């Protein structure tokens, strides 16, 4: 399994450009759909284009399962934008895309998760509720994440406008194995373990 988890993809994506150049990317903006600010989605698109990736966008909350399946099977890289972690996780579980994703990752494909896309990889996403409001129509009975990693990514650490809330989460969830990253850091996870890399 290969993962690249970050706070702000367009700031750090070039660190893994060899994994992206001329590759087929399934681009999933679903987490951002209900957000007021979505500038990060456009900047991610631009970086993928600059790196020569062949990008296909798909919204898992509205697209047919068979379409998602064929796109995931065809893709080299599966990318999740930032946005609301609870909305994204709800849609992944509701549609069965969570299991589809795990199947493709088992084949060695790369998943890139930005902010919400990184948070959902943890065993649970309950720790992020102070940063991400749970939607009123959230349909899951628990806050389970994808459980792809054994730690909890805390994106935008000490970065405006999340400085106070990230400090608060670090204090309140000190018993969790939190991994705080700022907007110029990313976490590479592969068969050998995980490491934080940084854009100068």
Residue ranges and their predicted role:
Residues 13, 35, 88-89, 121-122, ...:
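Glycine/Thr-rich phosphate-binding loops of Rossmann-like dinucleotide-binding domains
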């Amino acid at each position: 399994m290969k993962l690249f988890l970050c706070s702000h993809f367009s700031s750090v994506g070039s660190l893994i450009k060899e994994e992206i150049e001329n590759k087929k990317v399934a681009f999933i903006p679903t987490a951002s759909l209900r957000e007021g600010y979505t500038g990060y989605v456009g900047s991610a698109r631009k970086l993928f284009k600059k790196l020569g990736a062949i990008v296909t966008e798909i919204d898992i909350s509205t697209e047919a399962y068979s379409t998602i399946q064929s796109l995931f099977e065809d893709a080299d890289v599966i990318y999740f934008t930032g946005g609301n972690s609870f909305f994204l996780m709800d849609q992944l579980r509701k549609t069965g895309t969570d299991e589809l994703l795990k199947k493709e990752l088992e084949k060695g494909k790369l998943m890139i998760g930005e902010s919400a896309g990184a948070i959902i990889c943890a065993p649970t996403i309950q720790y992020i509720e102070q940063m991400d409001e749970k939607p009123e129509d959230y349909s899951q009975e628990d806050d389970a994440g994808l459980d792809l990693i054994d730690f909890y990514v805390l994106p935008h650490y000490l970065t405006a406008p999340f400085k106070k809330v990230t400090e608060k989460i670090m204090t309140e969830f000190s018993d969790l194995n939190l991994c705080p990253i700022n907007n110029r850091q990313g976490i590479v996870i592969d068969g050998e373990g995980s490491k934080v890399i940084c854009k100068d």
